[in-house]
Amino acid sequence: MGLEHLEEFSYPKEHGEEVEYDSEQGVRKIYVKSIKETFNFDNVSEEEKQEGGDYYLGKKEDELDEVVLRPNPHRFVLFPIKYHEIWQFYKKAEASFWTAEEIDLSKDLVDWDNKLNADERYFISTVLAYFAASDGIVNENLLERFSSEVQIPEARCVYGFQIMIENIHSETYSLLLDTYIREPKEKQRHFDAILTMGSIKAKAKWALRWINDEDSTYAIRLVAFAAVEGIFFSGSFASIFWLKKRGLMPGLTFSNELICRDEGLHTDFACLMFSHLKHRPGRKVVEAIIVEAVDIEKEYFTDALPVSLLGMNKDLMCQYIEFVADRLLVALGNDKYYNVTNPFDFMENISLAGKTNFFEKKVSDYQIAGVMSGTKRAEKDDHTFTIDEDF
C-alpha cells in the first residue's frame, strides 16, 4: 500500500466511524466507537471516577510515579537484572524462536483443494487475511508507543524480541495466503483485507485508534492491546485448531501451534506489566475495553462464518470469544463478565497464554537448547491467562 492510503487510518478522536462492508455477502455497516464513546461515563458519580473508583481513567501525570515508565538513566545497561519475572518472559520467548522456513506446506494444498469445501476455504482464508495484517498493527504499537514508553531494560528486551517474532508471524501468514490462494486478484484482495473487508477493517480501526491516541495512559492502552492479542486472535486460533482436530492442513496447523504459543506469551506479558503498575484504570474501564473488543470480534465472525460448518458456527464461536474474554478479565484483576463455558472440546487442553505444559511440549524440539538453563524456572503466578480451566 502506498502513502496515498495512510489517510485510511487517521482515526477521529471525538466521533466513531461506520465501516462499510463490500463483498458478495452484501453491504452492511459496522460502527467503530471513538475512545470518547467507549468511556462515556457521564452518568457516573465523580467519586467513582477518582483513583480507586471503578471508573477511574487514570492521568498522564500518574506515569511519572510508575517505576516501569518514569525516566531511567540505567535503561541502557541490562545487568544487574532487577525484574526477574519480566526477564523470565524474555528468556522464554528467546527459547521459543522459530522461522517461517521451518513450516512444511507441501501437503496442505491437497487438503485445501480436495478436502475443504468452498465455505471452509472462505472461512480459513478470511482468518488468514486478518492475521496477515494484524501482526503489523501490533508491531506499529510496539515501535511507536510501548518500546519508547517503557523505561526498564528487561521489558524493552521483551518488546524487542516480540517485534521480531511478530515479523515472523506476518511472514508466515503471508506465505500461507500466497500458497493457498492462487488467483491473483483474489490473493491481492486478501492481502489488502484491512482496506477491502469491512469486519477486518473494523478490527484494524479499533486497534489503530489506541496507537494514535495521545490522551489514554499506557495502562489503558496495555489493556487494549491485551484484548487485540488475547481476544481478536483467539477465535481465529480456535478455527485452525478445529482443522487440526479433523487431521487437515498439517503445515497450517503446526504454524498455528507455534504462533498461538507466542501470542499467549505476549498476552501473559501484558497482564504482568499491568500488575507492575501502581495507578491502574478502574474495573469498569477495563471491562468497557474488553467488552467492546468482544463485540467487534463477534461482528467479524458474522462475516467469516456466514454459514454453519461441521462442528463450527457463529454462535459457538461467539460463546468461545466470551469465554476467553472472561479469562482475560480475571487475569487483569476483574470479575468474569459473561460466565459462559468453553463450547469447543478441542480447545480444552490448549492455552492461549503459553501454559507450562504447552510451552514445554514445544510440538517438537522448538525450545532452543540451553537458553533456559541460565535462568531460574519461574513459578506459575496469578497472571497466567488460560482458556481451559475454571478459577
UniProtKB/Swiss-Prot annotation:
It is an enzyme of class 1 (oxidoreductase). Its EC number is 1.17.4.1. It catalyses: a 2'-deoxyribonucleoside 5'-diphosphate + [thioredoxin]-disulfide + H2O = a ribonucleoside 5'-diphosphate + [thioredoxin]-dithiol. Fe cation 2 binds at residues 166, 229, 263, 266. Fe cation 1 binds at residues 135, 166, 169. Binds 2 iron ions per subunit. Keywords: Cytoplasm, Deoxyribonucleotide synthesis, Iron, Metal-binding, Nucleus, Oxidoreductase. The active site is at residue 173. One of its GO terms (biological process) is pyrimidine nucleoside metabolic process. PANTHER family: RIBONUCLEOSIDE-DIPHOSPHATE REDUCTASE SMALL CHAIN (PTHR23409), RIBONUCLEOSIDE-DIPHOSPHATE REDUCTASE SUBUNIT M2 (PTHR23409:SF18). This is Ribonucleoside-diphosphate reductase small chain. Provides the precursors necessary for DNA synthesis. Catalyzes the biosynthesis of deoxyribonucleotides from the corresponding ribonucleotides. The keyword Metal-binding applies. InterPro entries: Ferritin-like_SF, RNR-like, RNR_small, RNR_small_AS, RNR_small_fam. Heterodimer of a large and a small subunit. Its cofactor is Fe cation. One of its GO terms (cellular component) is cytosol. The keyword Cytoplasm applies.
